[in-house]
A protein has these predicted regions:
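Domain-level recognition of soluble alpha/beta enzyme cores
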Residues: 24-147, 341-344
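Conserved hydrolase catalytic core segment
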Residues: 233-242
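The feature captures the conserved acid-bearing segment of alpha/beta-hydrolase catalytic domains
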Residues: 138-141, 242-317
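Bacterial N-terminal signal peptides that target proteins for export
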Residues: 1-8
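Alpha/beta-hydrolase active-site loop
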Residues: 159, 190-213, 233
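Short substrate-entry loop that stabilizes the transition state in hydrolases
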Residues: 128-185, 275-278
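Alpha/beta-hydrolase-fold serine-hydrolase catalytic core, especially in secreted/extracellular enzymes
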Residues: 25-43, 52, 59-62, 84, ...
Length: 399
């Protein structure tokens, strides 16, 4: 299909087919990230930079104030990196929340507007929680593979704090910026919005190349929901991307995206109610959407690992959302039928583990990690009924 139709159908494809528990008590649920840190400490560096090739409308401190039009595109960049272990004060979730208020204003907090309301809603009850990263910590000597993380629609760069810090502790430099529209902070569900976030990914790769602790010859793009779709756009257009990770993204090919020509490995996580056949039937059912070939079905010339998390709903692919008080209040509508919120949290931890092993296998070329990916979930210790996996090896691309 044309990209315009693809974008219009995004919300329908993303949300369709879900079933939820109606009577689960969520008052005692507490999300716990149980994966252990790697051999490194974690540093966080915040870089306030701008893309002068694109213009942007800056928000004022009040919705009634006029905005600056024609300014360069601000990209508050969060860099998580391996650092020597230390006893220095670590970040709190509240420290991360404070960063979000200066996403586009760089040092001058914006106290209202859509991004701030979003943060206040989903960070309620989390501000005192300790994180792993030490702000501006010393860098660990060496060069490490790069992971560019693309957030979901209109989301801050911090929506998966645990995942980003976890990967940094395991020897990756993880870089993220907010999901923003083409000309303003609010993301738009259209072609310019999708292309803008994809361009941000390439901008961050340019930035990563200049860092003293990166191995820019090994780069992965990862994204959640809308961010996974924009990561696909970036990977198709920027040949520096060596691997792709999708966290429950709506993947349908269109425009200049040709999955049957892609040769990089893809790790695609999805909810249990999504299957390759279901997505393909959506494509063929013209009452649902007018879609191009399903990306996963057409991804034949790059390795494809498709991991279905059976106990997980779409919103549970973010640790930040699972931690929030709002999630606990509304959780009954989130958990898939016959599964508990605790099982959804366990599934998130396994998602982080499989992400790590995928990156180890394809960016660090680790044979043990490659074997992990080939084993069944049960052989890797995953509890029964939480995960289903299919691994399809790449076939040769005809020339």
């Amino acid at each position: 299909m044309h990209l315009a139709t693809r974008i219009a159908a995004f919300g329908i494809v993303m949300c369709s087919g879900a079933s939820f528990v109606a009577g689960q008590d969520s008052s005692t649920f507490r999300f716990v990230f149980t994966e252990k840190p790697g051999q490194f400490g974690v540093g966080l560096r915040v870089v306030e930079q701008s893309d002068h090739s694109r213009t942007f409308q800056l928000e004022g401190g009040s919705s009634e104030k006029s905005a600056d039009v024609g300014s360069p595109r601000p990209l508050q960049t969060l860099v998580w990196y391996p650092a020597p272990s230390s006893n220095n004060r670590t970040m709190t979730f509240g420290d991360y929340e404070a960063l979000i208020k200066t996403e586009t204003s760089f040092g001058m907090p914006v106290e209202d507007g859509k991004p701030q309301k979003f943060v206040e809603s989903y960070m309620e009850g989390t501000t005192d929680l300790p994180a792993w990263a030490v702000r501006d910590a010393e860098m660990q000597p060496g060069r490490f593979p790069v992971v560019i993380y693309a957030p979901s629609l209109n989301a801050p760069a911090t929506e998966n704090i645990e995942l980003c810090e976890y990967l940094a502790s395991q020897g990756f430099v993880v870089i993220a910026s907010p999901s923003m529209g083409a000309t303003s902070r609010s993301m738009t569900v259209d072609i310019p919005g999708a292309n803008a976030e994809a361009q941000d990914i390439s901008f961050l790769i340019d930035f990563a190349v200049k860092l003293p602790d990166t191995d820019a010859s090994e780069v992965a793009a990862a994204g959640y929901s809308w961010g996974g779709m924009t990561a696909l756009l970036a990977a198709a257009r920027d040949k520096r991307v060596d691997a792709l990770i999708s966290l429950d993204s709506s993947f349908v090919a269109s425009g200049d995206i040709h999955p049957d020509q892609m040769t990089i490995p893809l790790l695609a996580f999805s909810r249990g109610d999504d299957t390759l056949e279901y997505s393909d039937s959506q494509r063929k059912d013209k009452t649902q959407c007018d879609c191009g070939p399903n990306v996963l079905n057409e991804w034949t010339h790059g390795d494809l690992l498709h991991v279905k998390l059976l106990a997980t709903s779409h919103i549970q692919f973010s640790s930040l959302y699972q931690r929030s008080e709002r999630f606990r209040k509304e959780a009954m509508q989130f958990s898939p039928a016959d599964y508990s919120l605790e099982e959804g949290a366990v599934s998130y931890n396994w998602m982080a583990r499989y992400t790590l092993e995928f990156l180890n296998a394809y960016l660090k070329h680790d044979d043990i990690a490659a074997l992990f990916l080939k084993r069944t979930p049960a052989e890797n210790g995953v509890p029964k009924h939480l995960m289903a996996i299919s691994l399809r090896q790449a076939s040769a691309l005809s020339r």
